[in-house]
Curated annotation (Swiss-Prot):
Keywords linked to the UniProt accession: Amino-acid biosynthesis, Cytoplasm, One-carbon metabolism, Pyridoxal phosphate, Transferase
Required cofactor names: pyridoxal 5'-phosphate
SUPFAM superfamilies associated with the record: PLP-dependent transferases
Subunit note: Homodimer.
UniProt protein name: Serine hydroxymethyltransferase 2
Biological classification of the source: Bacteria, Pseudomonadati, Pseudomonadota, Gammaproteobacteria, Enterobacterales
Binding of (6S)-5,6,7,8-tetrahydrofolate, residues: 121, 125-127, 356-358
Pfam entry (one): SHMT
Gene this chain is encoded by: glyA2
Function: Catalyzes the reversible interconversion of serine and glycine with tetrahydrofolate (THF) serving as the one-carbon carrier. This reaction serves as the major source of one-carbon groups required for the biosynthesis of purines, thymidylate, methionine, and other important biomolecules. Also exhibits THF-independent aldolase activity toward beta-hydroxyamino acids, producing glycine and aldehydes, via a retro-aldol mechanism.
InterPro entries tied to this protein: PyrdxlP-dep_Trfase, PyrdxlP-dep_Trfase_major, PyrdxlP-dep_Trfase_small, Ser_HO-MeTrfase, Ser_HO-MeTrfase-like, Ser_HO-MeTrfase_PLP_BS, SHMT-like_dom
CDD domains in UniProt: SHMT
Organism per entry: Pectobacterium atrosepticum (strain SCRI 1043 / ATCC BAA-672) (Erwinia carotovora subsp. atroseptica)
């Protein structure tokens, strides 16, 4: 029997202290990492439910354990709601994360050694789209596509030329740092010309897609993967979607998830996905996603007015990429200086970046989290100005940077107190 008289603070004060400090950080710092957001209290609460105790290997109606009748309800709701949310006829809600969903697609639809075409990580792609450090780059012949060096936009003509030359088995859409709409129809046409499977990883824009604020890759894509956090604002997890494909195709995807790469699904997380999908089906979610884009565009406008370069010259979604390659400091320097001012961003490579991924010449910023806490265009314009103040100070030298950093930190804390996350 568990001793329920002890609080976490009494039982494990070190861990309790870390949680309290993280809560304070989230409340008093501005979160501009494009892949982060704040889950709702309901999403967090259900992950603390008794569903965490239940093993449920297998799928609905075909479990390897008994006693699954109630967790089946949660998984069924998650599947049904995902289908409505993304207008599809297949949904697998079991992947533990987006990377696991992506691994399942590779396992289901390709063989090791196949040629796969994905967006270059240094130009906005993702590790799991073929980076040499990832399983996808180790076990497949990866052919990258990228951006036009002048416009910062995807060069679809060059993509088609490369595809016709290399004949990939699979073409990957999706990104981790691209601020414009992708032309899914054009990419499907390219895939069809070479007989390739067209897979879209929409992890960054799933919430925008659900709200109709970003083009839905279905039905152009044969298969779509996503995380369930980021713009979707659910728990940390993954999902696989498809529409109009054969039952055999769906069976391959299911088998790749279980038993292919996973054992028991995380039923408490699947239940939280169901809650998040229900939240995303409400009208308020569409209003939120529109504001996410409006806020990103407002920040881009101010940053450009202050003389900073943005890759692709703007944004159509929730993120923007600032090119600092002409500055006397690095992306890593900028990240650290902003963090000291309580503005959390992340260093990021830019096209043709001469620096390593650990240093970089860019900053990626996004507006999902600040929009969740209630920031509008006015607040985001202020925030963009403060961000530029810090970058200006970084270029001016340590003494001026210290003065600017302290002022901006006070302004950030005051703004955050006006728009609390949970308190």
């Amino acid at each position: 029997m568990y001793d329920t008289s002890l609080t976490l603070t009494e039982f494990d004060p070190e861990l309790a202290d870390a949680i309290l400090h993280e809560e304070d950080r989230q409340e008093t710092h501005v979160e501009l990492i494009a892949s982060e957001n704040y889950a709702s209290p309901l999403v967090m609460a259900i992950q603390n439910s008794v569903f965490t105790n239940k093993y449920a290997e297998g799928y609905l109606g075909k479990r390897y354990y008994s006693g699954c009748e109630y967790v089946d309800v949660a998984e069924r709701l998650a599947i049904e709601r995902a289908k409505v949310l993304f207008d599809c006829d297949y949904a697998n809600v079991q992947p533990h994360a987006g990377a696991q969903a992506n691994a399942a697609v590779f396992l289901a639809l390709t063989n090791p050694g196949d040629t796969v075409m994905g967006m270059n990580l240094a130009q906005g792609g993702h590790l799991t789209h073929g980076n040499p450090s990832n399983f996808s780059g180790r076990h497949y012949k990866i052919v990258p596509y990228g951006l036009d060096s002048e416009t910062g936009l995807i060069d679809y003509d060059e993509m088609e030329r490369i595809a016709l030359e290399t004949r990939p088995k699979m073409l990957i859409g999706g990104f981790s740092a691209y601020s414009r709409h992708k032309d899914w129809a054009r990419m499907r046409t390219i895939a069809d010309k070479v007989g390739a499977i067209f897979w879209v990883d929409m992890a960054h824009v799933a919430g925008l897609v659900a709200a109709g604020e970003y083009p839905n890759p279905l039905p152009q894509a044969h298969v779509v993967t996503s995380t369930t956090h980021k713009t979707l604002r659910g728990p940390r997890g993954g999902i696989i979607l498809a529409k109009g494909q054969s039952e055999d195709f769906y069976k391959k995807l299911n088998a790749a998830v279980f038993p292919g790469i996973q054992g028991g699904p995380l039923m408490h997380v699947i239940a939280a996905k169901a809650v998040a999908f229900k939240e995303a089906l409400r009208p308020e979610f569409t209003v939120y996603q529109r504001q996410v884009v409006a806020n990103a565009r407002a920040m881009a406008r101010i940053i450009q007015q202050r003389g900073y370069k943005i890759v692709s010259d703007g944004t159509d979604n929730h993120l923007l990429l600032i090119d600092l390659s002409a500055k006397p400091y690095t992306g890593k320097d900028a990240d650290a200086a902003l963090s000291d001012a309580y503005i959390t961003t992340n260093k990021n490579s830019v096209p043709n970046d001469p620096r390593s991924p650990f240093v970089t010449s860019g900053l990626r910023i996004g507006t999902p989290a600040v929009t969740t806490r209630g920031f509008g265009v006015t607040e985001c314009e202020q925030l963009a100005g403060w961000l530029c103040d810090v970058l200006d100070g970084l270029g001016a030298g340590n003494e001026e940077l210290t003065v600017i950093r302290d002022r901006v930190r006070e302004q950030v804390v005051a703004l955050c107190h006006r728009y609390p996350v949970y308190q």
